[in-house]
Amino acid sequence: MSVYAPNRQTIVPRVWVGCLACYNGGELVGTWYDAVDADRVLPEDIHGCPTTHEEMWVMDHECMPVRGELDPATAARWGHVIEAEAPQWREAYLAWLDDQGIDRPEDAPDADTFSEILVGEWPSFSDFAEMIVADLGILDGLPESVSNYFDLNAFARDLAYDYVILDSPHGTVWVYQNV
């Protein structure tokens, strides 16, 4: 089976780690880090000098399938889970996690499991269905007088029940196994 796989810019999950004591005191003190490093950020890293403030908190994030704030250890686990995925499929991975309502890193499939779930990316689901017809040879050997009656749109409509289909932000669709 062929797979349409465009070259995408790599998604790197990032987090804004801030000092919780400063935040509670009305001051925003923090900076952006790669999510995989979130659990290693020290108060001294944020403040630039030794401090009595001990609690760090992730107050904002990018490219992560969670809503709202989270602790640095969870952010780091998400970072590792997402970065384990092939760079060209991270965007599809995040979309699928969101669609499935997965909001804890321990519930997310690992890269090997996701590679079995993700079928690929196509310009449309009809293009995917057309590829299935060709790859399986559904119309091979049929006379043209018979194959002309094959309704690809109806086939694609029925086939869609067997898959999860998500629109990508690039005008294409991601196709996943229905698990």
PLM feature spans:
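Residue-level signal for secondary-structure boundary elements
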Residues: G25, E54, R90, P105, ...
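A broad, low-specificity signal marking well-ordered, structured residues that form hydrophobic/aromatic
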Residues: V15, T31, M56-W57, V164, ...
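Short coil/turn linker and secondary-structure boundary residues
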Residues: D37-V41, L70, G120-P123, G141, ...
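Extracytoplasmic/secretory-pathway segments with low complexity and glycosylation-like composition
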Residues: Y93-G137, G141, S145, A154, ...
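A broad, structure-centric signal for solvent-exposed, well-ordered loop/edge residues
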Residues: N24, R40-L42, P65, R157, ...
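Acidic, proline/glycine-rich low-complexity IDRs
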Residues: Y4-Q9, C19, A129-V179
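Structured domain cores in non-transmembrane regions
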Residues: R40-E106
